[in-house]
Amino acid sequence: LSLLWVNPSLAKLGSAEIVGDPIVNNNKVTLRIKVKEHNGRPALDLQDENFRLIVDGQPVKFKPQDWKSSRETTPPPVWIVFLLDYSGSMNTKDSKGTSKLTGAIDAIRSFIFATAKRNGDTRVVVVPFGEGQGVAANCNRPVTNDEIDRFFPAGDFKIESQLKRLAAGKPCASTNIYDPITETVKFFTNPEDGRFTVPEGEIKPRTSIILLSDGYQNKVGEPASFKRLISFLEKQESVIIHTLGYGLTPEELGRKYRLNRTAKRSDIGIGKPVKEEEFVDKEKLSKIAQVTSGVAEFSPDAQAVSEKLDIFLDAILGEYEISYLEPNPERGSKRQIKVIVTSDKDPKIESKPKDYNIGVFGRSLPRNHRLLMVFGIGTILSLGGFLPFWFWGKQLKREVLER
């Protein structure tokens, strides 16, 4: 069956990636593969026939039973930081009349419940962020290593206790998005933290940030700060950031205020047509997700927030798995593999190649070969011990008879 026949609504394929390093166990190689649609969302409905493996330029076959869908694989270890906008605008209501803070926390609660049902080793922390100075100093919500390093397993009651405390609070800070992202990425990429760095040949934990904001960076010097942030994010590859804008899109704001165009940052402020608390910087949130291979979504109401977080969950945990036997193992040799994903109506997409090494002991011989070798060696040893003794016995007997 073709992919599009199985799921006619599936968007066009966009990219394929071999996640982490191939795992080599004797003659068996196992890959984890992430496939995205053209819009950046995870492609979850592929079948085994949509995948082809190329090792050192040659196709390699795998058995259907050695392929696992994104719903069948055991999730890898995952660490998720929820960066929750705790600015004053989160007290306002969304397009359906729900408090944004209430809607966001309810959606996070549903996300964590769904994550726990996946039965993987997933740890989560919710970190509120916002900046308060002067008379608003009590509104300050800085993101520090201590605030980040409060992970609990998904489903742990301590997370629910934290969500209740946040829901009972009253956000009053201004929005500072870039610094919290920077501090969280630095936390995850600390080379001295053994939780996020593992020896070669082991599954590397996934580290993800989910940023939920209903606003924009309103500090002085924003353009330069954003440029520095993007430059910083482009230099790392291990942390994926998914961004969720909570509110109306600039296009929707343009229609609401009859601008006859998309709303811009220049449209907000005193004497301007768009209310400051309604503007969400879609362009910047999308760019942050793009440079880290994340997903960018927008939600006008609480129900949509929950639905978008489900997409993020699949993006974080949705990986295919394929195992195959190394066709030409040579002890200590290096191999290169790439994955090709196809469908009937889309052009094929290829992953970047990944290198892996065959162990110095090579692969085990088939069982029949091992049995033949044991039998042969046993026979040689038996004959080698028996025949000399037999000839010696005959010689002694002959000498006795000749006397």
Question: What is each model feature region?
Answer:
Residues 76-80, 90-92, 116-119, 130-182, ...:
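Short, charged loop segments at secondary-structure junctions
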Residues 1-4:
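Bacterial N-terminal signal peptides
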Residues 148-206, 219-220, 243-254, 280, ...:
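Von Willebrand factor
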Residues 66-79, 88-124, 151-152, 171:
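…and closely analogous acidic/polar surface helices at protein-protein or active-site interfaces
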Residues 25-27, 300-401:
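C-terminal "exit" segments of structured domains
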Residues 86-90, 130-135, 173, 215-219, ...:
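Solvent-exposed loop/turn segments at secondary-structure junctions
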Residues 199-204, 208, 213-291, 299, ...:
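VWA/integrin I-like adhesion module and closely mimicked acidic/polar interface patches used
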Residues 12-94:
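Acidic, polar low-complexity linker/tail segments
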